Amino acid sequence: MKVSLNVTNYSWPDGPTQLASRLISLAAAAEDGGLDTIWVNDHLLQADPGAGPGERDMLEAYDTLSFLAGTTTRIGLGAMVSAISYRAPALLIKAVTTLDVLSGGRAWLGVGAGYPGEAERLALPLPPTGQRFDLLADTLALARHMWTGQPGPFTGKRLTVPDPQGVPGPVRRGGVPVLVGGAGERRTLRLVAEYADACNLFDIPDEGVTLRHKLDVLREHCDDVGRDYAAIEKTVSTRLGAEETADQFAGRCARLAGWGLSHAVVITPGPWTARRLATLTSAARLVADA
């Protein structure tokens, strides 16, 4: 199983002036420790319901990922996940393509339909749910159109692009790998089957009942659209407990793998600390050796 970290909280105790050095140290330790990808939340406001009143620092996702690209050489880089209506589709595709080019082919495009709270507070665009899913499908189709060099205009259900050029293209042939976040059975998992290289589900504490069910639904969608289910990376967002040991977390990864997951994307209460990151990298080595 692959193991990655997700940065959801930037409120380290030494404040914003040290954020750059904190991120450099975090990225170096993650890369040296063998983690697969650094994910960052694509939020403008703190979205962790467990964050304290003083933990409000949040950085823009693609600026942060571009900064991390310049301080690392191997580890993957992605947003977990971008609300589809916050950026114009062509701009989002250009941003992730630029990240892929400048990182030497290490970017992920992580996208989802978005949710109301943050958009309402910051007056961000948030069309009705059905329109957002249409826009998500159009954006994924547009990315494929641009990354494969298809000629001519693009016309989707909600989106028309007269001249969808994307030069330079991504480093990897076929484009940047796509992760669609969310577990909605009718539309989200259908879009995974149609367009994505990975899904992202949530680690519900019910002994795998929900996760196995969601994967069964994804398999049905794959069968319906003629997609190879095995070709989709099954990621799961899960939390490393404050006192959890490497052995304990590796055991949880083994259970997740037994339920059909292949990639653990790990968050932690509060900002990442050196101790918690060391626990995670130790667990990643145990999982790799299993």
Residue ranges and their predicted role:
Residues 2-18, 84-153, 202, 271:
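Flexible, glycine-rich active-site loops centered on histidine and acidic residues
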Residues 30, 34, 42, 68, ...:
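Conserved, mostly hydrophobic/aromatic
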Residues 17-30, 92-95, 181-194, 244-257:
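Short, acidic/polar
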